Amino acid sequence: MMISFVYLVKRDPALLERRTRTNETRTVQKWIIAASVIYFLIVFVLPGFDKRFGWSAVPVWLVIVADLVVLAAFILYILVLHANTYASRVIEVEQGQQVITRGPYALVRHPMYLSMILMMTATPLALGSYWAFVPSLALIPLLAARAKNEEELLLKDLKGYREYTQKTHYRLFPGIW
């Protein structure tokens, strides 16, 4: 994440400001964010206990595959930041905002959520913990709900978004949803 911070400081300080906002107004989004905080604690703290007490025996090959998935997800995250200067943490439509159809947005409508799902479900395995992997799967419906909620706002308030949904059929997972 330090790389993305340096990238944003140099390339797009306005996007960095958008990514650090926390003034979400929608109740459902506040609940999703609160659940995400609990999730992050589980995913990053539980593997330490798992290692300490030897609860999981994740094979090295699986750790390496998970590391590669985390790396690919991080690259996708950077590509999203590069393509979309309006990628705010808060669900909103800003003045002058346009629909982005290039880069990862040509494949799915919410590539940042896809990158987070890949990164955060692979991280427990990369850290050698089956016990943290299981609860990490809860992130998938959380981010799917966030994407669906975000789409309601974008369809209503962002010019051209409805046409974009007709061209780019998948929200999160190419070929699936």
Residue ranges with predicted function:
Residues 1-102, 114-177:
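Membrane-anchoring alpha-helices and their flanking helix-loop junctions
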Residues 105:
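Short pre-catalytic strand/loop immediately N-terminal to key active-site residues, enriched for Gly-Thr
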Residues 108-109:
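Conserved SAM-binding loop
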